[in-house]
Amino acid sequence: MASQTILELWPSSSLEEVQTIIRAVYKQVLGNPHVMESERLVTAESQLCDRSITVREFVRSVAKSDFYRNRYFQSCAPYRFVELNFLHLLGRAPQDQREVSEHIVRTVAEGYDAEIDSYIDSSEYEAAFGENVVPYYRGRSSEANSKQVGFNRIFALDRGPAQIDSAVKSAQLVYAVATNSANAIKASSSTVIGSGTEKRFKILVQGSKFDSPRRISTTEYIVPASKMTPQIQRINRTSGKIVSITEIV
């Protein structure tokens, strides 16, 4: 396996080196796309070139761009959106169902910007990349305090240099994360979505627009993984608050 190239911006970095870092951020955060001139963040690029922002803040600008929002937030299932946020911003796959549920709930309750900020402002991001290292796929090598299954899961999300992440809309780690197990890179042909082998999840919801002013109800929804996205959309339409999402063993 090829070694991982780590790119860092230094005070002495040349303009050519800064441009290399800009291209690397686009590739990492946007999931290896072709970025048209009209889609580039000209202002943020200029700010990075004159050092008025750090690489960390440039990453934030790219992750909050219309490019990222349209391809990953608006076009993908919530579970897939969270998977890719972990991959693009922290360089790893989610470790367990608690992590995924926490981020889905945050996205629903606090919004898109809060979800993106939660990765970039985390102590994990600070420890791994600091202010001026371009995020990279850390799951390709073993690290202290990382779960061994994460080493395998990264390959389910990162299929190599030819992959464009936005081309895959469905979640890749639902079963592996929910059961805290290693995953196969390709789903078994014997596993059929909607069959008895499909994992189910419990969504706990508090309140909705149908509740009386004096009574806030709590409702549990049991849904298969393939139906999670439309169920979350229905909950949002009733103004319900998602309290937790847990896998049913």
Curated annotation (Swiss-Prot):
Transmembrane portions of the chain: none
- Which GO biological process entries does UniProt record here? photosynthesis
Per the UniProt entry, the disulfide pairs are: none
Record-level GO cellular component terms: phycobilisome; plasma membrane-derived thylakoid membrane
The record, for PROSITE patterns, names: CPCD_LIKE, PBS_LINKER
Task: Explain the induction of this protein.
Answer: By green light.
Subcellular location per UniProt equals: Cellular thylakoid membrane
Fetch the InterPro entries from UniProt: CpcD-like_dom, PBS_linker_dom, PBS_linker_sf, Phycobilisome
| Membrane topology of the entry | Peripheral membrane protein
Asked if Kinase is a keyword of the record, the answer is no
Locate the CpcD-like domain: which residues? 198-248
Question: In terms of domain of life, where is this protein from?
Answer: Bacteria
Q: Which family does it belong to?
A: Belongs to the phycobilisome linker protein family.
| Known partners and oligomeric status | The phycobilisome is a hemidiscoidal structure that is composed of two distinct substructures: a core complex and six rods radiating from the core.
The name of this protein is: Phycobilisome 27.9 kDa linker polypeptide, phycoerythrin-associated, rod
Its source organism is Microchaete diplosiphon
- Gene name tied to this protein: cpeD
